[in-house]
């Protein structure tokens, strides 16, 4: 599914690389934690997989294709195979929950009626069909995070990435979010979760990639 071969990334003006010489492989159907303190390089690694950043060295393979060589016209096709869950939700506050979830499909060219049907099915999977016509400010933080997850999976991605998805939630809500990720993984989705929530990792043990100052330690 995903393979990093000696991947490095440095930002202009930075005193040290964000990522240095990374080598790892995530097989199809795996669920893995990406662990590290703030600034360790977790978000940068996820952005490289999404094609939002370019590596300075090395190769990143996704389903047998080197994504470091993709053109700007090919990147959108890559992103349709990947879902991304954010810590800060990034929901449009003037659009209803179902409109937020359907929007990526409409942007990709799907008819709004079909996109709405798919969005409702995605909300079903996260238990929020009953909040479909609410605005994001009218629902709780935990529910907004579930909306972001519904949006991330609405296009049925092969790979789901999550960047600190429980950073703003209490332990009980965090556990519920991780249960959703486990459910998607059981259904065949490959999942990579960037987190520093050690307590939750201990409750839900999975293979870990540990980043420290841009280096992969384990």
From Swiss-Prot:
The keyword Cell division applies. One of its GO terms (biological process) is cell division. Homodimer. Forms a membrane-associated complex with FtsX. It is found in: Cell inner membrane. One of its GO terms (molecular function) is ATP hydrolysis activity. This is Cell division ATP-binding protein FtsE. ATP binds at residues 36-43. It comes from the Bacteria. It holds the Pfam family ABC_tran. GO terms for cellular component: plasma membrane. Belongs to the ABC transporter superfamily. It is a peripheral membrane protein. It comes from Haemophilus influenzae (strain ATCC 51907 / DSM 11121 / KW20 / Rd). The keyword Nuclease does not apply. Residues 2-218 form the ABC transporter domain. SUPFAM superfamilies: P-loop containing nucleoside triphosphate hydrolases. Gene3D superfamilies: P-loop containing nucleotide triphosphate hydrolases. Part of the ABC transporter FtsEX involved in cellular division. Important for assembly or stability of the septal ring. NCBIfam families: FtsE (TIGR02673). Keywords: ATP-binding, Cell cycle, Cell division, Cell inner membrane, Cell membrane, Membrane, Nucleotide-binding.
């Amino acid at each position: 599914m995903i393979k990093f071969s000696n991947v490095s990334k440095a930002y202009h003006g930075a005193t040290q690389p964000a990522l240095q010489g990374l080598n790892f492989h995530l097989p199809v159907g795996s669920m893995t934690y990406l662990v590290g303190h703030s600034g360790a390089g977790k978000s940068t690694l996820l952005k490289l997989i999404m094609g939002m950043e370019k590596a300075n060295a090395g190769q990143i393979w996704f389903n047998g294709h080197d994504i470091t060589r993709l053109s700007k016209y090919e990147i959108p096709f890559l992103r349709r195979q990947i879902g991304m869950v954010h810590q800060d939700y990034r929901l449009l506050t003037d659009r209803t929950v179902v409109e937020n979830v359907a929007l990526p499909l409409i942007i990709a060219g799907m008819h709004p009626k079909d996109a709405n049907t798919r969005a409702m099915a995605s909300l079903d999977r996260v238990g929020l069909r009953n909040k479909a016509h609410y605005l994001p400010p009218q629902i709780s933080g935990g529910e907004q995070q579930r909306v972001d997850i519904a949006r991330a999976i609405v296009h049925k991605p092969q790979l789901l990435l999550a960047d600190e998805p429980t950073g703003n939630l209490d332990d009980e809500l965090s556990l519920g979010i991780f249960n959703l990720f486990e459910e998607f993984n059981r259904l065949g989705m490959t999942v990579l979760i960037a987190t520093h929530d050690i307590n939750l990792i201990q409750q839900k043990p999975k293979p870990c990639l540990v980043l420290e100052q841009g280096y992969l330690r384990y």
